[in-house]
């Protein structure tokens, strides 16, 4: 497969890194430093404007995929539109699939959508995808990750087993889970374990549970502590990600949401939109403000400002002041291990959603959903078996899954 990637920032770089081992990849960026970094990969790097028709004409022939992921929505959309026009005027050229990264809510109102009529086969909003991911996690206060599959019919939730947990030392078969729930994987240090009933649960294990959403409501009492009150959430930062997330939380009856935003005008705007949230004008690193809001009583603190450094500082302060759980946004991939190293419960990245959607398109027919967990240590793939599939009619224990897959 041949892929053309426009934009060599965090998202573009990681898409290129994921695709380059088995595909022909061209990456275009007008920034000299970004292009130089991309040159470290086994890809063809072109320094220039990715929306330029002349440059696109040179690289689009035989391309299966064009992904525009610069930091400017309009550049990404124009690049896709231009690519479609070029292909339309070239006899014999294949119809390249186009994907645009878009952040402006005026252009998109769901994490992934299609605008094929204007030349964009797929629009992906990393910020909205991130907000949806965090909202899923917040529905289980003890969870460190959560994803929905099969159009909401199946839920994956990941829990961390603390050294003080009552589960430490018990066998897997002793877990009192609903009939429709199973532990599908355990992450233990650098190992990924497919568990069996006689396996022991150890401190610091990360356990992945899959099941029907309605059957997983009691998991809090198994893996965490059942919250008897409305979940108290403090959101620091109400930019694009924060606003998307606040709207999702604001709809939940069992959530008590407070927001700290440094921009006074943004506070006024947010307060007019949200019905149930308390919006505070201030700085998330202001210790006196955090204490005034009784941060030690917060079930979850979520830091999603546009600055990784500020999110890290806010999160560290929140943990030090007694917040039960802290989730922080980290745009830079090299920061993700740092966040977890210093004790932040969970670091989330907007780029992963975009990378996952692009990878899904390269993995062949039948792939409905693809997501990574544990910092890309593992992939979860939702696959639809066609009528002609070789696995139809076979018991699951007779299917030869790839090595390392359950």
Curated annotation (Swiss-Prot):
List, for all copies, the residue spans of the domain called RCK N-terminal.
1-124, 230-348
Q: Name one GO molecular function term.
A: potassium ion transmembrane transporter activity
- RCK C-terminal domain: which residues? 144-225
Top-level division of the source organism's lineage: Archaea
Provide the binding site for NAD(+) 1: 7-11, 29, 70-71, 101
Q: By its UniProt entry, which Pfam families does this protein fall under?
A: TrkA_C (PF02080), TrkA_N (PF02254)
Positions annotated to bind NAD(+) 2: 232-262
Q: Which GO terms describe its cellular component?
A: plasma membrane
Q: NCBIfam families in the record, alphabetically? A: PRK09496.1-2, PRK09496.2-1, PRK09496.2-3, PRK09496.3-2, PRK09496.3-4
For domains, the record's comment is: The RCK N-terminal domain binds NAD and possibly other effectors. This is expected to cause a conformation change that regulates potassium transport.
What is the role of the protein in this entry?
A: Part of a potassium transport system.
Which protein are we looking at? Trk system potassium uptake protein trkA homolog 1
Annotated source species: Methanosarcina mazei
